[in-house]
Amino acid sequence: MICHTYKCIFIHQRKCAGTSIIHAFDLDLSNPDWHFMNDGVLSREYKSAPAGYFRFSIIRNPWDRFVSGWKYLASTRDQSLPDVLARLPRKGADYRHLTRPQHAILYDKHGRLIVDYLMRFESLQRDFDRVCDLIGKPRRVLARDNRGDRSHYADYFDDDTRRMFLRHFGRDVELFGYDY
């Protein structure tokens, strides 16, 4: 999402409260700018991003994000966790919601973070208030859009599924400092 009024770019990570952020900017979703960099297509779009715009995104505990995506997607919600982890989607919306690691769209090919500020899902409102202060936008209470009803992520994992998970998402755990 790009917002020219506040000169900012929000990189939308799936299952990380992105819809709540987009709604907080009251953007016309029919405008093509709202989805600028929305799926982390960084090569061409990143280079053409307006100079001086504040870039931000949200990260989320990788285990919690995965469970949220797993339970959200119609194609996976009725499968067991071991089955989903053994056959992770490799393309399309299911890939973006479930399989793509968070770091894959937040770092460029040289390993540099491409945003100025990383919000944390776990401190969403506080971090959004900070972003608002930095860009000069009046603070606003975020809506809780697309919230699922499920157990705590730790209720789903055992030692085997944790190992399977870390083979694919361990870099997110390491880079963003999350603990199980």
Q: Model-found features: residue ranges?
A:
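Membrane-interface amphipathic segments in extracytoplasmic regions
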Residues: 1-180
